[in-house]
Regions:
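N-terminal, polar/charged subdomain of small-to-medium soluble alpha/beta proteins
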Residues: 1-102, 107-121, 125-150
Length: 150
């Protein structure tokens, strides 16, 4: 799979909706260390139906993010936008990723920053908890370790 481009270059999210007062971007990158060991690269694998799990995780995250605690959006505050969000864009790469490459990209546009921040964080958490994507991490000593298996 090709590296994810700068989110601003994607036609799906290049323009911020006129109703948005906030855009939050989460760019989950491959880092060069984990648990005190040097990391050389990662290989992500996914269940054949991972996309269905991803869509459910995003729906669950939006529902949780907009309905609970600080940043919750009341029907009155949402106005014409019943969901309280203007746009959501999510991509998770599969395959070999090098240090510094983007593994997970989440972009949330909303009328207000609290909802955008909260939903973005909830999307990342729900993806990690629900989506069958597995990470094989390769270390500088030649060893590797499978992790993140929901």
């Amino acid at each position: 799979e090709k590296p994810l481009a700068d989110p601003s270059s994607s036609p799906a999210i290049a323009d911020i909706p006129a109703t948005s007062g906030a855009r939050v971007v989460f760019n989950g990158c491959v880092r060069n260390h984990d648990g005190g060991q040097g990391v050389t690269h990662l290989i992500y694998s996914a269940h054949p139906e991972a996309e269905k799990f991803l869509l459910k995780a995003v729906r669950d995250a939006i529902e949780l993010g907009l309905s609970e605690g600080e940043g919750a959006v009341s029907p009155e505050a949402a106005g014409d936008n019943a969901a309280g969000l203007d746009a959501v864009f999510v991509r998770h790469r599969i395959g070999r990723l090098e240090i510094g490459e983007t593994a997970l990209l989440v972009v949330v546009d909303a009328p207000h920053r609290a909802a955008a921040f909260k939903v973005t964080a909830e999307i990342v958490d729900q993806i990690k908890a629900q989506v069958p994507i597995w990470k094989d991490q390769y270390f500088s000593d030649g060893s590797n370790h499978w992790s993140n298996c929901p």
